[in-house]
Amino acid sequence: MEKKVEAILEFDKIKKQLTEFASSSLGEQAILELAPATDFQVVQKTQLETEEGAKIIRLRGSAPITGLTDVFAHLKRLEIGGDLNGLEIYQIGSNLRVSRQMKNFMNDLLEIGVEIPLLGALSDELLVLKEVEEDIAISVDESGKVLDTASEALSTIRRTLRRTEDRVREKLESYLRDRNASKMLSDAVITIRNDRYVIPVKQEYKGHYGGIVHDQSASGQTLFIEPQSVVDLNNERKALQAKEKQEIERILAEISASLAAWINEIHHNTFILGRFDFIFAKARFGKAMKAVTPHLSDAGVVHLIAARHPLLDAAKVVANDIYLGEDFTTIVITGPNTGGKTITLKTLGLLTLMAQSGLQIPAQEDSTIAVFEHVFADIGDEQSIEQSLSTFSSHMTNIVSILENVNQKSLILYDELGAGTDPQEGAALAIAILDASHAKGASVVATTHYPELKAYGYNRVHATNASVEFNVETLSPTYKLLIGVPGRSNAFDISRRLGLSENIITEARSLVDTESADLNDMISSLEEKRNLAETEYEEARELARGADSLLKDLQKEISNYYQQKDKLIEQASEKAATIVEKAEAEAEEIIHELRTMQLNGAAGIKEHELIDAKTRLGNAKPKTINKTIPQAPKQKPHVFQEGDNVRVLSLGQKGTLLNKISDKEWNVQIGIIKMKIKTADLEYIQPEKPKKQRIITSVHSSGSPAKSELDLRGERYEDALQKVDKYLDEALLAGYPQVAIIHGKGTGALRTGVTEYLKNHRMVKSIRFGAAAEGGNGVTIVEFK
């Protein structure tokens, strides 16, 4: 890709903005070296890297890249046997710390199932040198100072040095406290000259303290004297300082030697961390721009949805759909100047360079952009931020160069093609250049104000017209790109709006040739039809929104119905269970009495006792509420057989047929009791069949109403997040004020991931772990706004 094109399309300004998102000079350097790739697979890989980086930023907010430094020069010195200073050693240690933190960070993401294959493989290349990192951490601080903990010898030397310095200061302070001090000293302070402690003595008292004169004031009235009493202590202090320096040099040399054994590993770690910084910078830049990862085409197909120029004010820039490469390969944008035509060219060109550099683009999801081998641009910079003039000859020189180098994998952007010369000749040249560009197989977008080119899109099957919408009411362009509608002159309409006489306008119209007038009328008709279509489209969208609102209300009512139904069924079930429990208890009591009677001998059971027991069993049946229900069609009576499960109607109990006594009577086993029961008192019980899943017809496309809880136990991390996302939408549609998400306790990884996701969901008001009765920290309760 030519550097000239990058400059014309202002790609350098994108890179400058991108550097603000880098955390280190390594990331910044990678950005400065960034250039659009032309190999399709390379572009795919860099886009996937950025997408994985964006996924991590969405999940974690940031990555542990802070503290990364360019240490390649330090490693060069180690390579030739040199020693490093304390700050250089600290910087290498900082990189080792970042390497370890980054590797752990990436491993944590991989363990919870986040799919980041490219960045996961990149982190696998990082080598953790924990012992080397720890040795550096106890040896030097961030300013490069060697710490007392670097060696026992250094710690001892420094303790002795501090004590010696204290003794020197104590001795000198005694002179300052002397009652004659104010007379003999210029100032009651201890200072340093030639790295030795001294006091300021007046000239006339220089012999009073003895010792060594190290300096004097500019006037000569004050001498800085090291009294004789501290000369030995100062000498001792200097000797200790020399020992300290020697020990520090030994420590730095020792650490440097240990680092020299790991030069290649540290070099590779630093390179990998620089890549991470670069990738995360791209991801954060994309997030700041509200950009998306585009689909890539290797066949020259471009379909940008709501594409925005990234260097224009995001609050003011007009988003446009730009499509090319399927139904046509050439777009000719016609219409007056200052209408936003050049911005369209630059938007397409700049977004192409960004995509081929692995950057996300400012457009909507599902946008597609092509990967080109060459992007050529001949753009007059009248509307560029960097303004300059261009002559016809310089434009033509540029076009000649383009046509010599273009191929079928090229995108050409022509701005005001054929301008700067006689209009008739310029229009003819423009048409010929467009035909020549198409013959080379290139994708072309060109702007022109020549009316002759308005018919180009109709006369060439490979081309289409386009224009930038102009609002005659406000006398200003809307900057909205209209593909398929050529631009038209608005001179008459504008003149009328500004008050020009209708007679003059009528005469002017009569002077316009019929063909041009017909063309303008055709364009005007197209615009009217398009505006009508847009109006009808908006009305249809409004109706669709209304229908959607009604649908949501209906879904809410259905959800409320099922909730109420479930509640009533639950209440009824509880009541029925209580009744049955009571009936079972009474039946057990009766059976116990009968068993006792049986143990006492059959002869002991009186007839009236059996009748009484039978009556009590009948009374123990749960009372049912008679309802008037449609009578089911009478079925053919069942022919009873031994082993059939039956219900004894008079007792309300289930039993099993043992043997047939006669057509009118059977022996029936009811629990532990064998009884003779009349056939008319028996009801056949069908064997239970597997229950079929009840299908509920719903207006919601996803099936039955959402439940008030979602069970994620056993799910993989990313699958779980997708289910949570879908479930929250369904729960919101169902109108639930709050829901429960069951993730289990386990290692806590799934719980942590779900919690982080919920914190960032725009419709979530609050989250909390469940109470003990709700499932504790194995459940998250979500309250909606």
From Swiss-Prot:
Name of the protein? Endonuclease MutS2
Per UniProt, the enzyme's principal EC class comes to: hydrolase
Keyword RNA-binding in annotation: yes
- Matching SMART domains, A to Z? MUTSac (SM00534), MUTSd (SM00533), SMR (SM00463)
Matches recorded under SUPFAM superfamilies: DNA repair protein MutS, domain III, P-loop containing nucleoside triphosphate hydrolases, SMR domain-like
Q: Which GO terms describe its biological process?
A: mismatch repair; negative regulation of DNA recombination; rescue of stalled ribosome
Keywords for this entry?
ATP-binding, DNA-binding, Endonuclease, Hydrolase, Nuclease, Nucleotide-binding, RNA-binding, rRNA-binding
Q: What is its EC number?
A: 3.1.-.-, 3.6.4.-
